[in-house]
């Protein structure tokens, strides 16, 4: 079974900022269709927020802004569209990007993910080889996919 031809890896980018104003104090996690994609507050008391969590196409767009030196402007414009009534600082006092070229793995269209996920847990009948993690799970790119997969593999081992 050629599982590797049925998955594709995508880049992942998380952008963290600290704002003095804490303008986001009344919001929880926000999911958008804008450039920033996901907005996840981390510590309201110090103004820390994951202002952008992107993968794939959105990640590549954001990386282009980073390369061109326009990331902060692009983020600010996205935020003003999402939160038009909030007073958002144009420049946070802190910014950090975390990039992974192979950040997430996804099943390709047409892949029998259930069958392949089960197969990958123990891909060899003649060797004690076990594979677990989110990459070949039914819930890829999320910790709970890895945890579920690890539990299923542990049942095979015991």
Where are these regions (language model features)?
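Conserved flavin/dinucleotide-binding core of flavoenzymes
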Residues: 11, 27-29, 33-158
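Central helical "cap/lid" subdomain
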Residues: 1-27
């Amino acid at each position: 079974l050629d599982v590797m031809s049925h998955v594709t890896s995508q880049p992942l980018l998380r952008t963290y900022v600290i704002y003095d104003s804490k303008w986001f104090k009344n919001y929880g996690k926000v999911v958008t269709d804008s450039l920033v994609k996901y907005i996840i507050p981390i510590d309201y008391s110090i103004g820390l927020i994951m202002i952008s969590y992107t993968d794939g196409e959105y990640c590549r767009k954001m990386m282009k802004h980073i390369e061109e030196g326009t990331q902060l402007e692009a983020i600010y414009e996205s935020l003003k569209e999402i939160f038009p009534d909030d007073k958002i600082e144009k420049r946070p006092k802190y910014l950090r990007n975390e990039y992974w070229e192979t950040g997430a793995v996804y099943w390709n269209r047409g892949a029998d993910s259930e069958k392949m996920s089960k197969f990958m847990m123990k891909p060899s009948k003649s060797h004690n080889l076990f594979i677990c993690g989110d990459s070949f799970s039914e819930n890829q790119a999320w910790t709970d996919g890895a945890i579920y997969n690890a539990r299923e593999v542990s049942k095979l081992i015991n």
